C-alpha cells in the first residue's frame, strides 16, 4: 500500500457489526479509488479525541454511527441543509481546518424507494412512523420529493408536534398519534425502533392496502415484524438494506466525487445476511 492511500473510517460504539467497511471497499474497487476504510471504536466519552487523532494521521473523512451523530453535528464547522434539518451528522469530510457535516440517511431512503423499488413519492400519501432521530433524519428529503401529504405519527402527539414544528413552512406535513390513524397510505415508513424488539408499532392495519409500499428502515436476514404485519394486510414490503447502501454511496460521492453503482453491492450484501 502506498503512503498516498487516502484514509476513511466509520466511528461508532459498538462498531464491529458495521457493514460500512465492506460496502466502501467494494465501492473503492469498483471505481478504482486509492483509499482504505476502517472501523474505529470510540470510547463513549472519546468521540472528539478519536476524530482529532484520525485527522492528525491523514484521515480524509468519516461516517458516524450510534451514538455519536449529535456530537458530529456539534463538531462540524459547516453543515449541509439536510444535516441542519436532521439535527445530526452521519458523514464528515475534512479539508484543512474545515469539517463539513452532512447527513445522507434521507437521501439513502429516498433513493432506495424511488430508484430501486421504483415507487414515486411525488403526489403520494406518505406515513412516517416515529418522531425520533431516524424520522428527523429523513423528513426533509422526503418533503423535497413533493408528496401530496406526509403524516408524521408517533405514540405521543407532543413529540411528533415538536418535530413537525421544525418544518413549519411545510403545509403537506401533518401530525397524528398511532391510535388516531384511520386512513390508508401509498407509502408507510417505519422509523421506530420497534423492529429491534420484534414488535410492531400499534397502528391500525387500515393504513395498508394492496397498493401500499411498507418500508422498514431496519433490516435483517428475515422480514421484520413490521414487514410481516404489513404483508399480512396486503402491502408490498421492503427493508432498509438498500437505504444503508444508498446512504453509503452518497457519502462516497461526497468524499471522492465519483458515484458508485449500488445494485451489485446490494445483491452481495443481501446474499450475506
UniProtKB/Swiss-Prot annotation:
Family: Belongs to the shikimate dehydrogenase family.
Molecular function in Gene Ontology: NADP binding; shikimate 3-dehydrogenase (NADP+) activity
UniProt xrefs under Pfam families: SDH_C (PF18317), Shikimate_DH (PF01488), Shikimate_dh_N (PF08501)
InterPro entries assigned to the protein according to its UniProt record, in alphabetical order: Aminoacid_DH-like_N_sf (IPR046346), NAD(P)-bd_dom_sf (IPR036291), SDH_C (IPR041121), Shikimate_DH (IPR011342), Shikimate_DH-bd_N (IPR013708), Shikimate_DH_fam (IPR022893), Shikm_DH/Glu-tRNA_Rdtase (IPR006151)
Sections of the chain in a coiled coil: none
Subunit structure: Homodimer.
Residues of the active site: 69
Protein name: Shikimate dehydrogenase (NADP(+))
E.C. no: 1.1.1.25
Keywords: Amino-acid biosynthesis, Aromatic amino acid biosynthesis, NADP, Oxidoreductase
Naturally occurring in which organism (per UniProt): Herminiimonas arsenicoxydans
Pathway assigned in UniProt: Metabolic intermediate biosynthesis; chorismate biosynthesis; chorismate from D-erythrose 4-phosphate and phosphoenolpyruvate: step 4/7
GO cellular component: cytosol
Keyword Ribosomal protein tagged: no
Class of the enzyme per the UniProt entry, highest EC level: oxidoreductase
Known role: Involved in the biosynthesis of the chorismate, which leads to the biosynthesis of aromatic amino acids. Catalyzes the reversible NADPH linked reduction of 3-dehydroshikimate (DHSA) to yield shikimate (SA).
Catalytic activity: shikimate + NADP(+) = 3-dehydroshikimate + NADPH + H(+)
Gene Ontology biological process terms, A to Z: amino acid biosynthetic process; aromatic amino acid family biosynthetic process; chorismate biosynthetic process; shikimate metabolic process
Record: residues binding shikimate: 18-20, 65, 90, 105, 219
Amino acid at each position: 500500500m502506498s503512503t498516498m492511500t487516502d484514509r476513511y473510517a466509520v466511528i461508532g460504539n459498538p462498531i464491529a457489526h458495521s457493514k460500512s467497511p465492506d460496502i466502501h471497499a467494494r465501492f473503492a474497487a469498483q471505481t478504482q479509488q486509492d483509499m482504505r476504510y476502517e472501523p474505529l471504536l470510540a470510547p463513549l466519552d472519546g468521540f472528539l479525541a478519536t476524530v482529532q487523532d484520525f485527522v492528525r494521521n491523514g484521515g480524509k473523512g468519516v461516517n458516524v454511527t450510534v451514538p455519536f451523530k449529535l456530537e458530529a453535528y456539534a463538531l462540524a464547522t459547516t453543515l449541509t441543509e439536510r444535516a441542519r434539518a436532521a439535527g445530526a451528522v452521519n458523514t464528515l469530510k475534512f479539508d484543512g481546518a474545515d469539517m463539513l457535516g452532512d447527513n445522507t440517511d434521507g437521501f439513502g431512503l429516498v433513493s432506495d424507494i424511488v430508484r430501486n423499488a421504483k415507487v414515486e413519492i411525488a403526489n403520494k400519501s406518505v406515513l412516517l412512523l416515529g418522531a425520533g432521530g431516524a424520522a428527523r433524519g429523513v423528513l426533509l428529503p422526503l418533503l423535497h420529493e413533493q408528496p401530496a401529504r406526509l403524516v408524521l405519527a408517533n405514540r405521543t402527539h407532543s413529540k411528533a408536534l415538536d418535530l413537525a414544528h421544525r418544518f413549519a413552512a411545510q403545509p403537506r406535513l401533518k401530525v397524528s398519534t398511532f391510535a388516531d390513524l384511520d386512513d390508508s397510505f401509498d407509502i408507510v415508513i417505519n422509523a421506530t425502533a420497534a423492529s429491534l424488539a420484534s414488535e410492531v408499532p400499534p397502528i391500525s392495519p387500515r393504513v395498508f392496502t394492496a397498493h401500499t409500499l411498507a418500508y422498514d428502515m431496519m433490516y435483517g436476514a428475515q422480514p421484520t415484524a413490521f414487514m410481516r404485519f404489513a404483508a399480512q394486510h396486503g402491502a408490498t414490503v421492503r427493508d432498509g438494506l438498500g437505504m444503508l447502501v444508498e446512504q453509503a454511496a452518497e457519502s462516497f460521492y461526497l468524499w471522492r466525487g465519483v458515484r458508485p453503482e449500488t445494485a451489485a453491492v446490494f445483491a452481495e450484501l443481501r446474499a450475506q445476511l
